[in-house]
UniProtKB/Swiss-Prot annotation:
GO aspect biological process, one term: regulation of transcription by RNA polymerase II
Classification lineage: Eukaryota, Metazoa, Chordata, Craniata, Vertebrata
Family per record: Belongs to the ELP4 family.
One MF term in the entry's GO annotations: phosphorylase kinase regulator activity
Listed Pfam families: PAXNEB (PF05625)
Keyword Magnesium in annotation: no
Organism annotation: Bos taurus (Bovine)
Full protein name: Elongator complex protein 4
Keywords, comma-separated and alphabetical: Cytoplasm, Nucleus, tRNA processing
């Protein structure tokens, strides 16, 4: 009886537990650690900041470079806390566009900017940023540039039909609240966006003084001043990741123009064995340390083609996380080469960061070319256009027939001498 009573009690208790579980929708699955529910919960691992997204490869927080095609090549975007080095083209025509795209993306996304230059006033640089294109305006503004170059789906290629299956580097635009935007380089960014944005300017001629002594730290005065300026902005404005602020988090976009040029007081572009060759590498080393512990991303343009010592270029590459080189066709033999008639230069992905990985995939970053259209700067996969003419084949047959007449009947011909050479 006792046993029966116990079983009955157990049955009733089990039934009541099941009923309670069904009433409260309780499952057997339990999350590890504290729950992320509730308005006051701060346990979310991923930081939610406007204009950013986590990488699908390594979970790193990414920002857009302002050029969606370049974001795709870099694995989704530029990782926060890293340095993007742009090797300037020979005449410095196309590299400033990537620099301006990066800054314009920061203004549209609501990020803070830090613009440093020894050549041009940062305020003037911001005035020359391209205007953003949002959804509907993209169709109106880019019909002439993009739609005219698209292949009709009903027209099939006669030669090299496999090109139809290649992925396209450019995609449609997105709304202002999403990741990455398109820009019209023929128009300037609205003045209202510049006035509402938060930016800091570093113009070297205004910051440097002749009495500044940096012999103890072995850095040029320009580099030392810039490092101090960046450090102050990171710590005072709350971009320090190791000491997070309670206010709303934001991203600091740092843009440094023409680093390593003589305008910065560096002579690595003048002589091969200069006394300050270590100054640039030490600057990059300290800069990376500041970026690693902060919510910031940096883009640097550098005239590497002017650096005399190739060993310095290798060190600069190793001290950068991502390296992209631009090779312009202006002034070279490729400018008149019919194979490159549809492009203005080549783009080389020298290095991709290994973030939370041992290796990185470089299979999709080869054979790339860029084209500057009327309103867009596009990156495309380099390919040769199909040759649909038969002029070459006909002329070669005529030349071959004439050569067989000169060779005579003893060189691979029959007695009649009417057949071509038999290989």
């Amino acid at each position: 009886m006792a046993a029966a009573g116990t079983c009955g009690t157990g049955t009733r208790s089990t039934g009541s537990m099941v009923a309670a579980a069904s009433t409260n929708n309780v499952t057997s699955f339990q999350r590890r650690g504290p729950r992320a529910s509730g308005a006051d919960s701060g346990c979310s691992r991923l930081v939610s900041i406007a204009g950013t997204r986590p990488s699908v490869r390594n979970g790193q927080l990414l920002v857009s470079t302002g050029l969606p095609a370049l974001d795709q090549l870099l694995g989704g975007g530029l990782a926060v806390g890293t340095v993007l080095l742009i090797e300037e083209d020979k005449y410095n025509i196309y590299s400033p566009l990537l620099f301006k795209y990066f800054l314009a993306e920061g203004i549209v996304s609501g990020h803070a900017l830090l613009v440093a230059s020894a050549k041009e006033d940062p305020a003037d640089i911001l005035q020359k940023l391209p205007a953003p294109l949002i959804d509907d305006s993209y169709k109106k503004e880019c019909d002439e540039d993009v739609c005219s170059h698209k292949m009709e789906p009903d027209i099939k290629m006669k030669i090299a039909w496999r090109y139809q299956l290649l992925p396209k580097m450019e995609a449609g635009p997105v709304s202002s609240s999403r990741f990455g935007h398109y820009y019209d380089i023929s128009k300037r960014i609205p003045q209202e966006l510049i006035e509402t944005s938060k930016w800091h300017g570093f113009f070297l001629p205004e910051k440097i003084s002749s009495a500044f002594n940096v012999e103890s730290c072995s850095l040029t005065p320009g580099y030392m001043k810039l490092l101090q300026f960046i450090q102050n902005i990171i710590y005072k404005e709350g971009f320090d990741g190791s000491n997070p602020q309670k206010k709303q988090k934001n991203i600091l976009r740092i843009g440094i123009q023409n680093l390593g040029s003589p305008l910065w007081g560096d002579d690595i572009c003048c002589t091969e064995n200069c006394d300050t060759s270590h100054s640039l590498t030490k600057f990059l080393y300290i800069l990376r340390g500041l970026l690693r512990t902060s919510l910031s991303a940096c883009i640097i343009t550098m005239p590497t083609h002017l650096i005399q010592n190739k060993a310095v270029i290798a060190r600069v590459t190793n001290l950068s996380d991502t390296v992209v080189g631009l090779e312009s066709f202006i002034g070279s033999e490729k400018e008149t080469n019919p194979l490159y008639k549809d492009y203005h230069g080549l783009i080389h992905i020298r290095q991709i960061p290994r973030l939370n990985n041992l290796i990185y995939d470089i299979s999709d970053v080869k054979d790339l070319a860029f084209k500057l259209k009327k309103k867009l700067f596009t990156i495309e996969r380099l390919h040769l256009p199909p040759d649909l003419s038969d002029t070459v084949s006909r002329s070669s047959k005529q030349d071959l027939a004439e050569s067989t007449k000169l060779l005579g009947p003893g060189c691979g011909m029959t007695a009649g001498g009417k057949k071509h050479l038999d290989f």
